[in-house]
């Protein structure tokens, strides 16, 4: 499966090749990656169980030009179960949550250790930013931004609202800010999960 990279909004107009020697190779890399069909999930995760009329749906989020989503679509119950398994066992930090039933996540702790690892990762990435590479299209500055906004390293987004008035979902940093305030034994609830293309 090809690596998924979010489209960059940095155009770099007016920069000369002499200033950014890797510009052309960066552009070619992005061009090749964007040719792949890229899908991910939006998970509705809340502190209280949400009524079904407040479930996220394929029309909740702003889609198309100037948004993170080309289009959104519903998923089957089978795909929902697979997506929840992926969330618990691959996306969230290992052992931090236990799935109870089909839609409850019980917090097991571990946020203190996790947040220190996140800070270490931010420091490591910031040390890699230099005057020579800060202007690279997908360079060290971009990688630093990714680890700050998306510490779980997932293309999935998270809809943390308990109503459907919010028209956007958020990267994993916002989910983990919510998680880091939980006490052991507290629960989160999984509402609707939708697929999106980007």
Where is each model-derived feature located?
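Short, extreme N-terminal segment that most often corresponds to the first beta-strand
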Residues: 21-71, 188-198
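Intrinsically disordered, low-complexity boundary segments flanking structured domains
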Residues: 26-32, 144-146, 172-182
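Generic extreme N-terminus detector
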Residues: 5-7, 42
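Positively charged N-terminal leader segments that act as targeting/secretion signals
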Residues: 7-14, 19-20
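Low-complexity, serine/threonine/proline-enriched polar segments
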Residues: 65-161
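Serine/proline-rich low-complexity intrinsically disordered segments, especially terminal tails, linkers
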Residues: 10-11, 24-27, 33, 78, ...
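Acidic, proline/glycine-rich low-complexity IDRs
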Residues: 158-198
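Methionine residue identity
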Residues: 1-3
């Amino acid at each position: 499966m090809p690596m998924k990279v979010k489209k960059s909004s940095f155009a770099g107009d007016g920069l000369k090749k002499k200033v950014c020697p890797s510009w052309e190779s960066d552009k070619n890399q992005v061009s090749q990656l964007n040719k792949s069909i890229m899908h991910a999930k939006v998970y509705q995760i809340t502190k209280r169980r949400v009524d079904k009329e407040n479930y996220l749906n394929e029309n909740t989020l702003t889609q198309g030009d100037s948004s993170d989503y080309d289009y959104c679509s519903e998923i089957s119950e089978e795909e929902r179960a697979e997506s929840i398994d992926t969330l618990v066992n691959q996306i969230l930090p290992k052992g931090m949550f236990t799935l109870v039933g089909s839609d409850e996540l019980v917090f097991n702790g571990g946020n203190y250790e996790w947040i220190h690892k996140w800070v270490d990762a931010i420091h490591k990435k910031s040390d890699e930013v230099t005057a020579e590479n800060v202007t690279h299209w997908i360079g060290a500055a971009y990688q630093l931004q990714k680890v700050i906004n998306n510490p779980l390293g997932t293309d999935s987004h998270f809809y943390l609202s308990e109503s459907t008035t919010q028209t956007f979902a958020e990267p994993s940093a916002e989910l983990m800010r919510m998680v880091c305030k939980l006490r052991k034994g507290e629960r989160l609830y999984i509402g609707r999960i939708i697929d999106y293309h980007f």
